[in-house]
């Protein structure tokens, strides 16, 4: 048999992006992604119920205090840095998204074999795109209610009418960039884990654990970026105040002080 006729043998072979699938209702379901995302969701709901129970007891827990501190800090940072006052529901929603995405990212870091027993659900584009749509679609609905139809349509033509196609593309790109940014970073971590798993066992432990530490940090950063962009998108779409409100309050204060200032009396007269 000649060399050309010999079968091509790979030194290593890594399956990337494969999922455990099942057929149901004529659709293909990634049941591993569904399982891990449900696990993260159950943990988030459990934390919420626990904080609600401690709030009813009259003695707030450390977790509740931390959550309230995060919400207050987020609102304050957005208002002070950008002059935008976000709607009250935005910061709690962003913090909840942060915790959920963080748990989804960290599930893939849990010690396991190759392939992972519990792969990170955020390494599946279906979940990240769903999360992005969950953020963007309600944002447009809330923006339409806050601004009204006329003002909502008019903001696509700002600052000039020629910017209309650019503004439309920008809005269409928001869910895509949100989804791809999170997916790409977490998926690349899964690729690294798969490649490290091919190393000999006697040297695998060191790079594997070093990468898991890096992966933990990447999970935090990506969850934070997703939550931060959520806040910024809603801040611009549902802002109830900002510089305009501050100026209005300042003008109101000046006018009230002018009204309250006493009229000058003729010389020699006192009140």
From Swiss-Prot:
<dbReference type="InterPro" id="IPR000568">
    <property type="entry name" value="ATP_synth_F0_asu"/>
</dbReference>
<feature type="transmembrane region" description="Helical">
    <location>
        <begin position="216"/>
        <end position="236"/>
    </location>
</feature>
<comment type="similarity">
    <text>Belongs to the ATPase A chain family.</text>
</comment>
<keyword id="KW-0813">Transport</keyword>
<keyword id="KW-1003">Cell membrane</keyword>
<dbReference type="InterPro" id="IPR045082">
    <property type="entry name" value="ATP_syn_F0_a_bact/chloroplast"/>
</dbReference>
<dbReference type="GO" id="GO:0045259">
    <property type="term" value="C:proton-transporting ATP synthase complex"/>
</dbReference>
<dbReference type="GO" id="GO:0046933">
    <property type="term" value="F:proton-transporting ATP synthase activity, rotational mechanism"/>
</dbReference>
<keyword id="KW-0138">CF(0)</keyword>
<keyword id="KW-0406">Ion transport</keyword>
<keyword id="KW-1133">Transmembrane helix</keyword>
<feature type="transmembrane region" description="Helical">
    <location>
        <begin position="89"/>
        <end position="109"/>
    </location>
</feature>
<dbReference type="InterPro" id="IPR023011">
    <property type="entry name" value="ATP_synth_F0_asu_AS"/>
</dbReference>
<feature type="transmembrane region" description="Helical">
    <location>
        <begin position="124"/>
        <end position="144"/>
    </location>
</feature>
<feature type="transmembrane region" description="Helical">
    <location>
        <begin position="186"/>
        <end position="206"/>
    </location>
</feature>
<feature type="region of interest" description="Disordered">
    <location>
        <begin position="247"/>
        <end position="271"/>
    </location>
</feature>
<protein>
    <recommendedName>
        <fullName>ATP synthase subunit a</fullName>
    </recommendedName>
</protein>
<dbReference type="InterPro" id="IPR035908">
    <property type="entry name" value="F0_ATP_A_sf"/>
</dbReference>
<dbReference type="GO" id="GO:0042777">
    <property type="term" value="P:proton motive force-driven plasma membrane ATP synthesis"/>
</dbReference>
<dbReference type="GO" id="GO:0005886">
    <property type="term" value="C:plasma membrane"/>
</dbReference>
<comment type="function">
    <text>Key component of the proton channel; it plays a direct role in the translocation of protons across the membrane.</text>
</comment>
<comment type="subunit">
    <text>F-type ATPases have 2 components, CF(1) - the catalytic core - and CF(0) - the membrane proton channel. CF(1) has five subunits: alpha(3), beta(3), gamma(1), delta(1), epsilon(1). CF(0) has three main subunits: a(1), b(2) and c(9-12). The alpha and beta chains form an alternating ring which encloses part of the gamma chain. CF(1) is attached to CF(0) by a central stalk formed by the gamma and epsilon chains, while a peripheral stalk is formed by the delta and b chains.</text>
</comment>
<keyword id="KW-0066">ATP synthesis</keyword>
<feature type="transmembrane region" description="Helical">
    <location>
        <begin position="31"/>
        <end position="51"/>
    </location>
</feature>
<keyword id="KW-0812">Transmembrane</keyword>
<keyword id="KW-0375">Hydrogen ion transport</keyword>
<dbReference type="Pfam" id="PF00119">
    <property type="entry name" value="ATP-synt_A"/>
</dbReference>
<keyword id="KW-0472">Membrane</keyword>
């Amino acid at each position: 048999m000649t060399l050309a006729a010999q079968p091509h043998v790979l030194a290593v072979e890594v399956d990337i992006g494969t999922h455990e699938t099942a057929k149901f209702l004529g659709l293909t379901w990634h049941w591993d992604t569904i399982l891990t995302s449900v696990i993260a969701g159950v943990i988030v709901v459990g934390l919420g119920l626990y904080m609600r129970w401690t709030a009813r007891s009259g003695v707030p827990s450390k977790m509740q205090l931390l959550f309230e501190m995060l919400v207050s800090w987020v609102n304050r940072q957005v208002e002070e840095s950008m002059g935008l006052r976000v709607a009250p529901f935005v910061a709690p929603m962003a913090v909840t998204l942060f915790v959920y995405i963080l748990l989804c990212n960290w599930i893939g870091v849990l010690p396991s074999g190759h392939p992972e027993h519990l792969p990170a659900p955020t390494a599946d584009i279906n979940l990240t795109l769903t999360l992005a749509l969950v953020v963007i679609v309600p944002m447009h609905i809330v923006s339409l209610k806050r601004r009204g139809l006329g003002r909502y349509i008019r903001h696509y033509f700002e600052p000039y009418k020629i910017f209309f196609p650019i503004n439309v593309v920008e809005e269409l790109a928001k869910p895509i960039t949100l989804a791809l940014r999170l997916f790409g970073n977490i998926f690349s971590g899964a690729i690294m884990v798969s490649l490290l798993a091919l190393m000999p066992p006697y040297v695998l432990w060191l790079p594997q654990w070093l990468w898991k530490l890096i992966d933990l940090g990447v999970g935090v950063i990506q969850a934070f970026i997703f939550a931060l962009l959520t806040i910024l998108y809603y801040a611009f779409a549902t802002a109830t105040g900002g510089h305009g409100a501050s100026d209005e309050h300042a003008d109101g204060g000046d006018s009230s002080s002018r009204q309250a200032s006493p009229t000058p009396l003729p010389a020699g007269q006192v009140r």
